[in-house]
Structures are given as C-alpha cells and as structure tokens.
C-alpha cells in the first residue's frame, strides 16, 4: 500500500475510508455481536428492535447467533428478523438446532446442568475465536434479554476503547450486570460501592471484578489473546473454581492483568433478572412487563418493529376487580395521556380517560356559577399564597369523579392522575391490597401513591401486612375510593369552603395539622388507609428534567382576582418535592430488595 500524503506528512493508514481536502476519515471499528438464545420469545422482538436501532454503521457489524433446546418460537423470531435485516450487516452467522426441549441432564429449562455449562462455554469460546479470525476490533457478548434503549450504546462502548467494558443495565430491583466484589471462592460479595454505582452516586467507568450479560471485549489489546471461557486454557494450577463461563472469563482477565470496567456515564438500557431453577416463565413475563413500564416512563413508548409485532400477544385488559378506573388528564397534555395508555396496554388495565378541568379555562364568573367559595384564611402551607387555578381545576376533576361514581352507583373506583410511575408487579400487589381491604372492611379510601408528611411511624391496619392507617399526606397520584367514601367527601360540600384536594382528604380523615382549617369541616369521619409499600410514585419531582406542574405553576386566585405572576418564595418546599423523612421511615415505606444474590449458576440467560 502506498503512503498517503496528508498536509505534507507521510502517513501509512489501514482502513482509510476517504480523503477530503486534506482530512482523513477512518472507518468505524469492526464489531462482532454474539448472542446465545434460548426460550426468549417474549424478549426477542424488543431485543432485536433496540439492537437494530443502534446508531453504529451496520456494515461494520457482524452477527453471530446460536440457539437450541427451545420450547417456544425463538427460532422463528430470529429467522423473521434476519430475513429483513441481513443485507444491512457486514455478515450474519446463525446456527440453531431444533432438538429436544431439555438436555438429558436438565431438570427444567432454567436448570444449569453440567452439559448446559459445557455448551455455553464451548459456544462462547467459538465466538471469541471467530472474532479473532475475522479481524474484528471488538466482540460484544449480548444476552437476549438485554434491551439497549440508548441507541448510542455500541458507539459509546467502542469510543471508550477499554480492554473490557460493560454498559450498566438496570432491572426491576437492585440486580445489574456487574459485581463490585468477589470472594476468594469466586462468589458474589456485597460492597457499598455497588449501590453507589448502581444509583449513579458516582458516574464514569470503574474497574470491577466481574461483568456479564453485555460485555464489550477489545480484541486489539495484546493481552486479550489470553482471554478465555474455557478453564483448560487458563494457566495451569491457577483456577480451582466452578465450571462457569462468566467466572472463568473474569479470572482469565484477572490472570492476564486485563481490567474489567462497568460504565454508568450514560443510561444504556435494561436487563431481566435471571430465573432461578423451578421458576415459572410467568415470572419472566412479569419482569418484562416491569421493564417495559420503566422504559415507557423514560421514553414514552416501547420500540417494537412492525414486522415483529405479530409475535407479541396483546395483554388482555381488566379493571383488577374494581368497578371502574378513571385516569385524569388535561386534554392539552396528549403526551402524558399517550404515555399512560401505553402503560395501561402493557399492564392490561381497562381505564377510562377522564378529561381534567383545565385551570386555564376557569374564570371568576365560572367559579361563581359552579358555586365555589374558598376556605376563609386559606394559604398554601409553604408558599403562603391562595389556591392557584390549576389547584382548583384539580379539585374539580376529582370532585366530578366522586359525583359520577355516586350517580352510577360504582362500589369501588380507582382514580389515577397522569404523572405516575407504576411500581413493579403492580397488578399482583394491588390484588394483595384489595384482598386485605375487603377481608378487613370498613375503609373509605386507600392511597396507592402519596407524599408522607409526618415522621411518626404509621400503624399497620390490624390484620394486614399491606396496609397502614394513613397519616397527613400530600398528592392524589392514585387512590382507591369506595362508594361510601365518595358520599362522605361530597356530603361535606367542599366547594363552599375550597382547599386543594390533597389538603381536603387528610382533613376529612381527621389527620391534618392546621386546626383552623379543620374546624370548618364537621363530619371528619373518612377512613383512610395506604398501601405499604406504595404502589405508585411521581414520574418527576421538582427540579427534575421534564418536571411540569399544572397546579403549582398556574395563575392563582385572591378573592377571585387572578394573580398572574406568583412571586412566592422559590426556595420553599413544593408539593412536587420528594419526601424529606428520616432514613428509617423511608426504609420502612419502600420495597427493600437486596442485590439478587443468586447462585452463580443462575446468573444466566443464555442457552
């Protein structure tokens, strides 16, 4: 090859793409993507949709897939996707076997037998060797239940140019695709640093003893020749651990002085927690639902290619056993409405859109026509200001639902706002709460999501492990209300002494700190409980990117005179702020899920 002259310099280049006006552009490094696939019909349509949308030149990507021992349509989905995209990629190597559902020594499809480990080790080693022979620059080992929602993931990992690096992936718990500690006998060791990295308390690329499930290997590193999944290739006498591909690979890196890194300098995507032996497939389906709900919360919708949609069954919808479900949403907020209905589609919720009363459309005359009068002396506890038009519209929206459920004689109604995030296993946990509530009886309202405003521990409802007696709370993110509860809230004629709805409800269950307000309401006999842990949280808090409040940030009223410029103290706490409770209280009120300390054998999702 002749030297290339560039601005008076002689440079010998390999892989030059083009020279334009003295500048030289290089082709992107070659990447081999390796995936071992078994019984992933439920994840593959999403796995492929997000993989296809990676913004990295496809003619610089080769695909290497293997699949066997399936009990579902995994092979059909792989074939369908490859039929459409193969020509886009540099090369495709797909091998599969249509053999028995289980190996002879497997007890179930989630059992990691000796033969299964041997097959995975053999195939991964074959793929690594293939990458070397084809002169790939990088090999990306990618599990089929990893959803790379960040389209720049591959480009980012390549640009880091590290020997071994994994993008940190999130799950519906504390599980991720890296370890921060490993014991002398090769087991997971919990460390404080793990949560610091997982929770983005520190960001960057950090050396760790173990990465798995999505691992980029730089083949250009000289020492990478020593990397192996096969313990027979390790230095004699060094390794005495289990026959496990990810452990062996990590130790081969260790023996070769090749550091492994986890990267959390970007948000990359999600991973499902591997099933343990004996776990039913339904558990994985629930995990996938949780993950899709997370993705919708972050991105608004799920990426699913048109030709893969027929592989995804529609989720049947129901009302979870209650009379009706309403979702309050301003008609001028279609993006929130669409996001919520995307959630409902994934969760299987039959929900009616209830158009919210828009504070922007309210006027002094309209309020007089409705019969609205304000509680004498009311001022927001933090801003010391009257109600905003948005808060009035919010109250009226809830009020009209209470009226409607009484008119239609609806026994139990779930009321949802449009800025909520569903907790994992939402429907299953709602069923548990409903079972307890109906068995115990006597309730009027049950918070599913709220902001607690008292430090004192709330007492458990006698006979329940899912319900507490509600203390003073903000927010009406979501609550279950009985017909009797709706009647109680209406009979007090709240429009004649209006306060925000999330002040009115605590007043009515007689747990409000402002006695001067409370004394205006006589029948404070609402029985209010709360789900514990909570089932709903806000999508955003004050100060978060994307935080919008249609109640706090609207015009306020002052004896029916609009004040268009709210000059209240911006440093005061807003209702959109997170709870500021003691750490003990927070621990008691949230799901505590440690890292899934699964056996090494079950930290798997490949063949």
Curated annotation (Swiss-Prot):
Subcellular location: Endoplasmic reticulum lumen
UniProt GO cellular component terms: endoplasmic reticulum lumen
Protein name: Glycosyltransferase 25 family member
Keyword field: Endoplasmic reticulum, Glycoprotein, Glycosyltransferase, Signal, Transferase
Signal sequence interval, chain numbering: 1-22
UniProt xrefs under Gene3D superfamilies: Spore Coat Polysaccharide Biosynthesis Protein SpsA, Chain A
Domain of life, per lineage: Eukaryota
Glycan attachment positions: 226, 254, 514, 565
GO MF, one annotated term: procollagen galactosyltransferase activity
CDD domains, alphabetized: Glyco_transf_25
């Amino acid at each position: 090859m002749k030297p290339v002259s560039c601005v008076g310099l002689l440079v010998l280049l390999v892989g030059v793409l083009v020279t334009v006006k003295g500048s030289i552009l290089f082709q992107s490094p070659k990447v081999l993507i390796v995936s071992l696939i078994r019984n992933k019909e439920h994840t593959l349509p999403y796995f492929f949709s997000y993989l296809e949308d990676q913004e990295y030149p496809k003619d610089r990507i080769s695909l290497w897939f293997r699949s066997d021992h399936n009990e579902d349509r995994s092979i059909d989905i792989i074939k369908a996707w490859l039929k459409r995209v193969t020509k886009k990629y540099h090369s495709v190597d797909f091998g599969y076997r249509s053999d028995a559902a289980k190996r002879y020594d497997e007890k179930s499809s989630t059992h990691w037998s000796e033969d299964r480990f041997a097959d995975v080790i053999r195939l991964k080693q074959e793929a690594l060797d293939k990458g070397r022979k084809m002169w790939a620059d990088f090999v990306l080992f990618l599990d089929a239940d990893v959803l790379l929602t960040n389209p720049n993931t591959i480009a980012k990992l390549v640009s880091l140019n590290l020997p071994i690096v994994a993008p940190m992936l999130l799950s519906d718990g504390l599980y991720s695709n890296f370890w921060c500690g490993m014991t002398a006998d090769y087991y997971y060791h919990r460390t404080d640093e793990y949560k610091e990295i997982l929770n983005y308390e520190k960001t960057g690329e950090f050396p760790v003893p173990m990465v798995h499930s999505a691992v980029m290997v730089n083949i250009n590193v000289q020492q990478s020749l020593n990397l192996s999944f096969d313990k027979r290739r390790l230095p004699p006498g060094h390794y005495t651990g289990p026959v496990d591909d990810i452990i062996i690979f990590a130790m081969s890196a260790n023996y070769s002085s090749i550091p492994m890194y986890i990267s959390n300098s970007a948000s990359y995507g999600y991973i499902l927690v591997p099933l343990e032996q004996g776990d039913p497939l339904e558990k994985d389906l629930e995990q996938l639902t949780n993950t899709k709900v997370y993705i919708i919360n972050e991105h608004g919708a799920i990426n699913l290619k048109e030709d893969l949609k027929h592989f995804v069954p529609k989720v049947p919808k129901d009302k979870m056993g209650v009379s009706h479900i309403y979702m309050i949403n301003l008609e001028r907020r279609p993006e929130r409405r669409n996001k919520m209905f995307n959630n409902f589609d994934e969760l299987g919720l039959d929900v009616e859109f209830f158009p919210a009363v828009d504070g922007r459309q309210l006027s002094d005359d309209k309020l007089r026509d409705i019969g609205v009068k304000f509680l004498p002396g009311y001022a927001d506890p933090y801003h010391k200001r009257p109600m905003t038009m948005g808060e009035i519209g919010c109250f009226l929206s809830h009020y009209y639902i209470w009226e409607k459920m009484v008119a239609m004689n609806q026994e139990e109604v779930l009321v949802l706002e449009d800025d909520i995030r569903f907790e994992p296993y939402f429907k299953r946990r709602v069923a548990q709460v409903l079972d307890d509530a109906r068995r115990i009886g006597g309730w009027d309202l049950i918070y599913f999501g709220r902001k607690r405003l008292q430090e004192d521990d709330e007492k458990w409802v006698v006979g329940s492990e899912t319900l507490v007696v509600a203390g003073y709370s903000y927010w009406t993110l979501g609550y279950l209300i009985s017909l009797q509860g709706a009647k109680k809230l209406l009979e007090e004629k709240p429009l004649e002494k209006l306060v925000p709805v999330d002040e009115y409800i605590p007043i009515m269950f007689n747990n409000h700190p402002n006695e001067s307000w409370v004394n205006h309401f006589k029948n404070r006999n609402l029985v209010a409980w709360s789900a514990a842990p909570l089932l709903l949280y806000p999508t955003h808090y004050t100060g978060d990117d994307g935080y919008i409040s249609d109640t706090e940030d609207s015009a306020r009223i002052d004896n029916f005179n609009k004040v268009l410029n709210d000059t209240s103290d911006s440093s005061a706490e807003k209702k959109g702020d997170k709870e500021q409770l003691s750490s003990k209280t927070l621990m008691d009120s949230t799901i505590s899920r440690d890292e899934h300390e699964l056996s090494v054998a079950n930290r798997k999702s490949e063949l």
